[in-house]
Amino acid sequence: MSIHAGGLQVPVSVIIPAAGSGRRMGGGTAKQFLPLRGEPVLVRTVRRFSECPLVDEIVIAAGDVEATRALVGHMPKVTRIVQGGAERQDSVWAALQAVHSRPRIVAVHDAARPLLTADVLKGVLQAAADHPAQVVAVPVQDTIKQVGPDGVVVATPDRSMLWAVQTPQVFWADVLVRAFRQAIADGFLGTDDASLVERIGVPVRVYRGHPGNLKLTTPTDFRLAELLLEEEARQC
């Protein structure tokens, strides 16, 4: 359907980097292929976007292209599955080059976050129509300590100013492309896409998300996700 920005209908592309090995899960299967209540994690993640009327296309950067195509290539709005890279940043860049060339908004979302709610997705996409960089985030609940290499606390940041960043992270396409090109030129490797955009001086805004939008990293995360899905099913 696209969204309205500046009086124009702007197509929305979603990039899902899915080339991770999931080493922290143990075993030989990448976490995006592991079952979660009877369905692979990646299937659940892709469905969250394919069912969103604001999304026009989904591009996936995969470690195993053929296995990924067999799993989700038939799903609505999946237009391309490209080879991912050694780092997450490499995978996002590969997918970014594969999106359609029309002016658009690009949302980048972790393959291992299958619990994104429809309300948060719709809200952050609509917010991005008016601002070139939006990231889903939640306020931190724990006290955070900055610790030096010797294990001694250096500082205690003001918790009221700290947010835990999730995905999707949503950008105007030209801004994201410029940020990636600058990072490549500088040899910079960021921990998320927003850090690249911050480096080129574009303000990044937070859109309040939901704590249940977990990134599945450990077996404990999977158990918690199963409980959240059970609760979601009871509410339907």
Swiss-Prot record:
Domain of life: Bacteria
Keywords attached to this entry: Isoprene biosynthesis, Nucleotidyltransferase, Transferase
Site, Positions MEP for the nucleophilic attack: residue positions: 159, 215
Sites annotated Transition state stabilizer: 24, 31
A single MF term (Gene Ontology): 2-C-methyl-D-erythritol 4-phosphate cytidylyltransferase activity
Membrane-spanning ranges: none
Reaction(s) this enzyme catalyzes, per UniProt: 2-C-methyl-D-erythritol 4-phosphate + CTP + H(+) = 4-CDP-2-C-methyl-D-erythritol + diphosphate
Enzyme Commission (EC) number: 2.7.7.60
Pathway(s) of this molecule: Isoprenoid biosynthesis; isopentenyl diphosphate biosynthesis via DXP pathway; isopentenyl diphosphate from 1-deoxy-D-xylulose 5-phosphate: step 2/6
Pfam families: IspD
UniProt-listed GO biological process terms: isopentenyl diphosphate biosynthetic process, methylerythritol 4-phosphate pathway
Family, as annotated: Belongs to the IspD/TarI cytidylyltransferase family. IspD subfamily.
Functional note: Catalyzes the formation of 4-diphosphocytidyl-2-C-methyl-D-erythritol from CTP and 2-C-methyl-D-erythritol 4-phosphate (MEP).
Protein's recorded name: 2-C-methyl-D-erythritol 4-phosphate cytidylyltransferase
UniProt organism field: Symbiobacterium thermophilum (strain DSM 24528 / JCM 14929 / IAM 14863 / T)
